[in-house]
């Protein structure tokens, strides 16, 4: 080894002769004595080049610049009194160099490595190997390593075995577009990269493996956003002879144990509340609610229906919904600020937004007067009606009530989005808190108005509630599913369900989704045939590793916890991928590039 110790030296190492190797983090010339901060993965330590110890070392010290790779030998010493640095873990000690060797020089980096300054993300991704040298990215990857290591150890202790499944599989579209791989040996035929190992892990249950897991790479050719990548990693799990309670207990123990081991400084709930899908959408406007703050959606349809406000009366008469949320402390918003909120509501599909300001002074709701209320709706609503709206939405004097009216689904979506954005703007979320919950009681199917057909809410392998089986023939929209999601801080961090394990029931679900028998047999025949050989009852779940590590690290994009991510256009800026390949490779694959029509 070119080093005997890491740079994470402490007072316990005083008097020890060490050989270190790392990167020059900073260099300071103090009139004949040169100081550098030497950095490796474990830490940073000050190294002193003093001519009284070694003139040759001083000469090397004069050559050093930021990011040079250096080997240095010396003795760990206490720093002189008054020069200690309490901001560094190694700030009480230094290494006095007696031998030094430059292992490699370095060009000037395109951005500072030794400062956590904001750098354009495209530049960071192009030079990701330099970006990872920075403390924030390095810490994120270490958190990821610790999280994955805990997951493996936890599941091993629970009797699971890790089994790898193929990356080249058959294309059986499950929602998103597949990444296709043309076969050279079978012209005109294609493999697909797995969107998840869903069918493979179910086949492992048929095979009698009972408890399986895998740190699985998954691929989906879909539009990107902050928490999506074309390739991502999930902790894939499946168990035989279990029900929903077993799987939810496993998830609760896994996530709480993980936080306790990897980020014990974070606040988290050890028992996960259960929220029905219906309650989640009605109270929070989405099926992955952030429970770190209140601001629940309040239904005020009955108040609007009996009020003198024509807009509200019409919506209620047509079977629509009228709902409100309270923005705490925003009663003093001016016209421009309120207009900004109105435009935000319109962006998400609302025809408009009705703000009701309860004044700028904090106080009790019982003390509210009409003089304090500022709103275009004030002349149509009685004081008692406004007080009731305030009471339901949790508003008090000094707050701003925001009301949306229209189709119920739209109202929930708009206020749900506004709730989340206002929470960020008003600093209502504690970044150091993880608020877990289970979302349950999902419907099995949802109607696709555009395609005029039923879709799976989760995926087509999710089992229906046994009590709802008769409804599959008469009213599929009312069939409940045996699905369970884990949500945290406004993200779905794990989705799971008890699976269908009978061939006839699985075929029936496919029929409801619009597949004919020929399509079913061509795409899923292998699975249905396997179910005829004694498939056990089974269920599974797949926590998203990228997304949960993002929350553990306090980040807002999964790109911050992936070593070499794609950008939001699904491009790899470091390698320049996707890229053009030569004509011979194209011909060997028996494919032809067709120019896109303008």
Curated annotation (Swiss-Prot):
| Similarity comment | Belongs to the class-II aminoacyl-tRNA synthetase family. Type 1 subfamily.
- Principal localization reads cytoplasm
* Catalytic activity annotation: tRNA(Asx) + L-aspartate + ATP = L-aspartyl-tRNA(Asx) + AMP + diphosphate
> Which positions bind ATP?
220-222, 229, 492, 544-547
Role this protein plays: Aspartyl-tRNA synthetase with relaxed tRNA specificity since it is able to aspartylate not only its cognate tRNA(Asp) but also tRNA(Asn). Reaction proceeds in two steps: L-aspartate is first activated by ATP to form Asp-AMP and then transferred to the acceptor end of tRNA(Asp/Asn).
**In the UniProt record, what gene is named as encoding this protein?**
aspS
What EC numbers are recorded for this enzyme? 6.1.1.23
Complex formation: Homodimer.
Residues at which L-aspartate binds: 174, 220, 458, 499
Q: Name one GO molecular function term.
A: nucleic acid binding
What InterPro entries does the database record attribute to this sequence? Aa-tRNA-synt_II, aa-tRNA-synth_II, aa-tRNA-synth_II/BPL/LPL, Asp-tRNA-ligase_1, Asp-tRNA-ligase_1_N, Asp/Asn-tRNA-synth_IIb, AspRS_core, GAD-like_sf
What species is given as this protein's source?
Dehalococcoides mccartyi (strain ATCC BAA-2100 / JCM 16839 / KCTC 5957 / BAV1)
Protein name per Swiss-Prot or TrEMBL: Aspartate--tRNA(Asp/Asn) ligase
GO biological process terms, semicolon-separated: aspartyl-tRNA aminoacylation
In this chain, the stretch annotated as Aspartate covers 198-201
